[in-house]
Amino acid sequence: NTLNAKRCDVIIGTNTTYDALDTTKPYYRAGHVWIYREDSGYDISSWDSPDLKKAVIGLVDKSPVTQALSRNGLMANAKPYRIQRDLTKSPGEPVEDVVSGKIDVAIMWGPLGGYYAKQSDVDLVVVEIPEYAEGNSRLQGKTYWNISAGVRKREVERREMVEGAIFRNLDKIYAIMDEYGIPHTEPIFVDRLDGYKRHKK
């Protein structure tokens, strides 16, 4: 709405396949992460981790990872957060609760969780949930997306200008993301869970 009202001209950090926008080629790919205290002794690298089975797990209500929790018998461990529906809540509340000990593990959208974990005074571990590893197949649901910048439909010249600026400065962009704790991986161009291509390399 803000874009179409011409209150801004570019939206950064949007899903590459978002049809309401004309998006640039993706410049990174992001997914969900597990976050836990370093002093917890946890070692989580897959949905089969014994540590997940004994943990209180916080996640945003109706998050895409809910399907994975259900498939792995972890819903009884889950504590939902209604952050998206309550503007009085901090987006970093699950991380704050990991720090305070209210929950053991937070599952969050990587760019959001990584940022808040980086700000913490307590040492936290941020682990990217494997995208296509065993145990995170189609049955687990889609938890990763290519990320682009977007402009209004039919503004081809503006899109090309923004795209050029992004890719000329990609190393600087990645350095800033690293500084703020934002996990990122290389975009992929055939996503079997999307079922189609949006951009070619």
Q: Model features per residue range: what roles?
A:
Residues N15-A30, Y115-K153:
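Ligand-binding "clamshell"
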Residues V10, N15-A20, S40-Y42, K62-Q67, ...:
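Solvent-exposed loop/turn segments at secondary-structure junctions
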Residues D39-G41, W47-V65, S137-H184:
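Extended ligand-binding regions for polar small-molecule ligands
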Residues N4, C8, D39-S40, S70-L74, ...:
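Sec-exported extracytoplasmic/periplasmic mature domains
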Residues L3-G13, K54-V56, P94, V98-M108, ...:
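Alpha-to-beta junction loops
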